[in-house]
Regions:
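ATPase catalytic-site recognition across NTP-hydrolyzing enzymes
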Residues: 1-42
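Short, solvent-exposed loop/turn segments at secondary-structure junctions
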Residues: 13, 46-47, 100-101
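Proline-rich low-complexity regions
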Residues: 21, 179-180
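Acidic, glycine-rich loop-and-beta core segments that form the ion-binding/anion-interacting portion
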Residues: 31-65
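Mg2+-dependent endonuclease catalytic cores in nucleic-acid-processing enzymes, primarily RNase H-like
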Residues: 51, 56-178
Length: 180
């Protein structure tokens, strides 16, 4: 599909090196009852963006319903934004495990914030497992057809998906198993 969009339809873009190609921008239901499960993901940031995604799961597909994407804000400033934007406090919010104090602040505010368990593995192996899951690679022997649907209002998520690529070896021109 990416090659057709670029070479067939004449759209701008680069096919090579994209980490995820199984996503599309689409108007999707914002009714949480339309999904089998709802989760919230949060990647803490300050200089880099603090990103919160409201996700729906249905039939093995991921639906990115809403995003909060802010820079240079303390947790105490972000919590009211999440409440104002209707992020459901009673759904599990999976958070970056490196920031237990921030998780505690969310819990104190009434959110079901939990640290993501990175198990006892290297950061690279953990990241690789996350990418495999997003692609639909459940195990070495089981792959499912998974599509990630992104609501058009999630402009920062769309931008990140368009820019998330594998590192390219400058000498050989080959892509490495290392996200950038």
């Amino acid at each position: 599909p990416e090659g057709y969009q670029i070479y067939g339809l004449g759209e701008w873009g680069e096919v090579g090196g994209l980490i995820l190609k199984n996503w599309t921008v689409q108007n999707i239901s914002q009714n949480l009852d339309d999904y089998d499960d709802i989760a919230i993901g949060q990647d803490f940031g300050f200089n880099h963006a603090n990103a919160i995604l409201l996700l729906g799961i249905k039939d093995d597909n991921i639906y990115i319903l809403q995003e909060i994407y802010v820079f240079e804000k303390e947790t105490a400033e972000i919590i009211p934004l999440a409440i104002q934007d209707g992020i459901p406090a009673k759904r599990t919010m999976w958070c970056d495990s490196a920031e237990p104090d921030r998780i505690k602040a969310w819990r104190t505010a009434g959110f079901r914030a939990r640290a993501v368990s990175k198990e006892h593995t290297t950061e690279k192996k953990y990241q690789s497992a996350q990418i495999d899951w997003l692609k639909g690679i459940v195990s070495k022997d089981r792959v499912i057809h998974r599509t990630i649907y992104v609501h058009p209002s999630c402009v920062n998520t769309i931008k990140e998906l368009q820019q998330w690529k594998w590192k390219k070896d400058e000498r050989t021109g080959e892509y490495l198993d290392e996200p950038v």
